Amino acid sequence: MNTFSQVWVFSDTPSRLPELMNGAQALANQINTFVLNDADGAQAIQLGANHVWKLSGKPDERMIEDYAGVMADTIRQHGADGLVLLPNTRRGKLLAAKLGYRLNAAVSNDASAVSVQDGKATVKHMVYGGLAIGEERIATPYAVLTISSGTFDVAQPDASRTGETHTVEWQAPAVAITRTATQARQSNSVDLDKARLVVSVGRGIGSKENIALAEQLCKAIGAELACSRPVAENEKWMEHERYVGISNLMLKPELYLAVGISGQIQHMVGANASQTIFAINKDKNAPIFQYADYGIVGDAVKILPALTAALAR
């Protein structure tokens, strides 16, 4: 048997749902999708859900992962085994841990490939900081997986599809975290997963102010701006949501233009699926040139304005 009898899908990030649904179609005969509102439910049915389970009644101060109890109860009531697919977001991983405990299921995070052999999930994901790919065969009846972005293609909606809708009512867990305050995060995040062209900056750009040069190039060619992990987490020059690498974004654009990025394996794991990689770095021995299809050795601060002017013609 090369499919599960059923799969359960949930995404706290609506933009990740189409990819998870496409994966679900390949892995199971019946697709169940947990959603938070009617709009997401309608989308899930168009993407292939046979049954939609609307999670309802959570107090505003409680967290999404507190639905884990009623989600696990629903899953158990409808089969003695099954596959659970979640995005590898922070909240997705929190929910995965709680579901794993309640279902007595193995949990595998950041899956980059999933298949079914003899009714059991086989999962591949990066290990040793991206230096190798590990393969796990999950032996428990239930398997809970968080999926890396780009693992599956995106499912296309079909308005003619139909499905059944159910309601799952909130039940307060015995132990829970209560939200006491919410502070809006200053962010200009974009959906980089869908970007066709990406300009990504590393610390070789020199300063936060110099990132404006990359932004001008983005405007000239219609690209989105990304960065390396040190730019986001060490220097705090850009938002966390924009960094590319094994522990965050895994991109597959048509063009990935790496500016001042050394090309360490942890970063390239998130970029080497790009159709074309173009590198700009003043160090001719930078590892990035081993991955690049095209490269320029030189100072990015001088090259970017000239490149922008040429491409804007």
From Swiss-Prot:
Pathway: Amine and polyamine metabolism; carnitine metabolism. FAD binds at residues 255-283. InterPro entries: DHS-like_NAD/FAD-binding_dom, ETF_a/b_N, ETF_a/FixB, ETF_asu_C, ETF_asu_C_CS, FixB, Rossmann-like_a/b/a_fold. GO terms for molecular function: electron transfer activity; flavin adenine dinucleotide binding. It holds the Pfam family ETF_alpha. Keywords: Electron transport, FAD, Flavoprotein, Transport. GO terms for biological process: carnitine metabolic process; fatty acid beta-oxidation using acyl-CoA dehydrogenase. Gene3D superfamilies: HUPs, TPP-binding domain. Heterodimer of FixA and FixB. Required for anaerobic carnitine reduction. May bring reductant to CaiA. Belongs to the ETF alpha-subunit/FixB family. This is Protein FixB. The gene is fixB.
